[in-house]
């Protein structure tokens, strides 16, 4: 990514997940914004921002946060919305276990209340410890939680897999959570 791309990518994430009104726009029911509208809005803060810049940011984003529709006339975040959108995801069977990385400061609450989606549409889970670790390190002293997704699924909990391979569900009860050691 170019020097400013990381900063612009974070701003695009804010717009596409939480605050499209920052640039005077509104997401459609599926979370999409018109690409030309987004570029015009971004040009208020980032003069000269173009379709080439947007395509590069989407292509080079290591987390795969964004996707275009087929003709690249619209763009959306693949998950992480605090705004209600229908991503059109089908419920599917998850792996036997999934993982959630978090900070030590949140463990007491999680072990009391479970994993809750808070301001997001879904709880985010990872298929492997490595990915959960990357996510969890942002929250301070890292703790990895193992989630018994097989039992959750058997108990009727629905799981979804986002386009960028983040596992999503509405809630994880305490009984399905186990703290694991990284030794």
From Swiss-Prot:
Record GO biological process: tRNA splicing, via endonucleolytic cleavage and ligation
One GO MF term: NAD+ poly-ADP-ribosyltransferase activity
UniProt KW keywords: NAD, Transferase
SUPFAM superfamilies (alphabetical): ADP-ribosylation
EC number: 2.7.1.-
Function statement: Removes the 2'-phosphate from RNA via an intermediate in which the phosphate is ADP-ribosylated by NAD followed by a presumed transesterification to release the RNA and generate ADP-ribose 1''-2''-cyclic phosphate (APPR>P). May function as an ADP-ribosylase.
Family assignment from sequence similarity: Belongs to the KptA/TPT1 family.
Protein name: Probable RNA 2'-phosphotransferase
Gene it is expressed from: kptA
């Amino acid at each position: 990514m170019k020097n400013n791309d990381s900063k612009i990518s974070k701003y695009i994430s804010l717009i596409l997940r939480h605050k499209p009104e920052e640039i005077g726009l509104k997401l459609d029911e599926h979370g999409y914004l018109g690409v030309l509208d987004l570029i015009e809005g971004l040009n208020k803060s980032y003069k000269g921002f173009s379709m080439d810049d947007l395509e590069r940011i989407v292509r080079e984003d290591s987390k795969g946060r964004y996707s275009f529709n087929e003709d690249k006339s619209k763009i959306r975040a693949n998950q992480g919305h605090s705004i209600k959108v229908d991503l059109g995801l089908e419920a599917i069977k998850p792996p036997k276990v999934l993982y959630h990385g978090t900070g030590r400061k949140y463990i007491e609450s999680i072990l009391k209340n479970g994993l809750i989606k808070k301001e997001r549409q879904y709880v985010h889970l990872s298929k492997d410890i490595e990915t959960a670790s990357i996510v969890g390190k942002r929250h301070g002293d890292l703790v990895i939680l193992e989630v018994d997704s097989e039992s959750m699924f058997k108990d009727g909990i629905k799981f979804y897999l986002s386009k960028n391979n983040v596992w999503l569900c509405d809630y994880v009860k305490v009984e399905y959570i186990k703290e694991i050691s990284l030794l």
